[in-house]
A protein has these predicted regions:
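Secondary-structure boundary/capping motif
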Residues: 40, 71, 99-103
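ATP-dependent phospho-/nucleotidyl transfer catalytic cores
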Residues: 66-69
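Short helix-capping and hinge/turn segments at secondary-structure transitions, especially at repeat
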Residues: 8, 38-42, 106
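Short, isolated positions within intrinsically disordered regulatory regions of eukaryotic proteins
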Residues: 11, 25, 35, 82-85, ...
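An alpha-helical support segment within catalytic cores of ATP-dependent transferases
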Residues: 10-13, 52, 61, 103
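ATP/Mg2+ or Mg2+-diphosphate-binding catalytic cores
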Residues: 80-114
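Active-site activation/catalytic loop segments of kinase-like enzymes and analogous catalytic loops
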Residues: 30-59, 72-90
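Active-site acidic catalytic loop and adjacent metal/ATP-binding pocket
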Residues: 1-31
């Protein structure tokens, strides 16, 4: 979850670390990259650069599909979460759920084509 509260600057090496105690325990690290991509509205070129930096080499087809799958999982989770919030938060949350679901469907198409 790339909220600003989840970034930590190391005093030792001036590197930024993304932490998220909600999901970090037993989750795939690619989940966090997928979430950064989604929340940052990354382009395919941004995604490739992010994955290349993380993996240390250009992602192969399986690595890219794994990343796309995680983008789908992220939007699925937040679509369901938003739908549960509609009775309490109203139309803005419904709109957010619809936006997430539309992107999920777009990424399903990209996954099938990859």
């Amino acid at each position: 979850d790339p909220l600003c509260e989840n970034w930590v600057l190391s005093a030792d090496d001036d590197r930024l670390y993304l932490i998220d105690w909600e999901y970090a325990g037993m989750n795939d690290g690619i989940w966090d990259l997928a979430d950064v991509s989604i929340e940052g509205v990354f382009t395919p070129e941004n995604d490739e650069l992010l994955l290349t930096e993380y993996l240390g080499s250009k992602p192969d087809q399986n690595e890219y599909k794994h990343f796309l799958a995680n983008k789908i999982y992220v939007d699925y989770l937040w679509t369901l979460w938003a739908k549960t919030r509609v009775p309490y938060d109203g139309q803005p949350m419904e709109d957010w759920a619809v936006e997430r679901y539309a992107r999920l469907k777009d990424n399903l198409r990209l996954f099938a084509e990859a």
